[in-house]
């Protein structure tokens, strides 16, 4: 009991280097930035914005998610991605290995998307009998980047609990939509793209697809 009473009285002070990193000047500027932000709180709007972004893509799409399912909203996203791929848009899909194995390998829409030449699927830490001790190493990222111009980032997974109005069993969450007006020079956009590339290049990410049209690579679980 005494520990609980007196422990809050001790507060370790950050060292000078760390305190310098937390200065307000590191996060603010006197000049206007070139990125515009919109908060998205509604689940139906969250799905619509994802579909709008994917539909508007001309060059590239990056979609990273923890839990993508082949339910109503997930199928909407997969159909939109397939349509974008048909137009020649380069697509990179980064998904966590557990939910990919549970919910996607039997999806025809996912199989069709993964088989396209201009689509790469990266699976983070695929389920593997030899990697049982790394089973809890999961990726919870959730964002979409389109044409190096805009991104949507937040806490929503890619399924009916978080997107659309297909079910009454919903989760309350929020996304931030960021549009860059500086031709790809927006700082937060660049940081997110650099972060994605860092994760994409991790050894635990198994990448399938791209210019390889071997149908055996469509199933992206780890052998």
Annotate each predicted stretch with a short phrase.
Residues 1-119, 129-141, 146-223:
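Charged, low-complexity intrinsically disordered terminal segments
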């Amino acid at each position: 009991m005494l520990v609980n009473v007196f422990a809050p009285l001790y507060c370790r002070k950050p060292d000078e280097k760390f305190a310098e990193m937390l200065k307000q000047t590191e996060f603010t500027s006197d000049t206007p930035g070139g990125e515009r932000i919109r908060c998205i709180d509604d689940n139906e709007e969250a799905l619509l914005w994802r579909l709008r972004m994917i539909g508007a893509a001309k060059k590239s799409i990056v979609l990273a998610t923890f839990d993508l399912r082949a339910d109503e909203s997930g199928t909407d996203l997969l159909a939109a991605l397939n349509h974008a791929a048909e137009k020649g848009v380069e697509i990179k899909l980064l998904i966590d290995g557990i939910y990919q194995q549970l919910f996607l390998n039997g999806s025809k829409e996912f199989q069709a998307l993964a088989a396209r030449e201009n689509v790469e699927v990266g699976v983070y830490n695929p389920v593997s009998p030899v990697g049982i001790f790394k089973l809890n190493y999961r990726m919870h990222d959730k964002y979409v980047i389109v044409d190096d111009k805009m991104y949507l980032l937040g806490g929503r997974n890619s399924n009916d609990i978080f997107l659309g109005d297909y079910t009454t069993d919903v989760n309350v969450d929020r996304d931030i939509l960021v549009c860059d007006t500086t031709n790809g020079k927006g700082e937060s956009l660049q940081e997110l793209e650099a972060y994605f590339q860092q994760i994409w290049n991790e050894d635990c990410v198994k990448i399938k697809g791209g210019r390889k049209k071997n149908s055996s690579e469509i199933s992206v679980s780890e052998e």
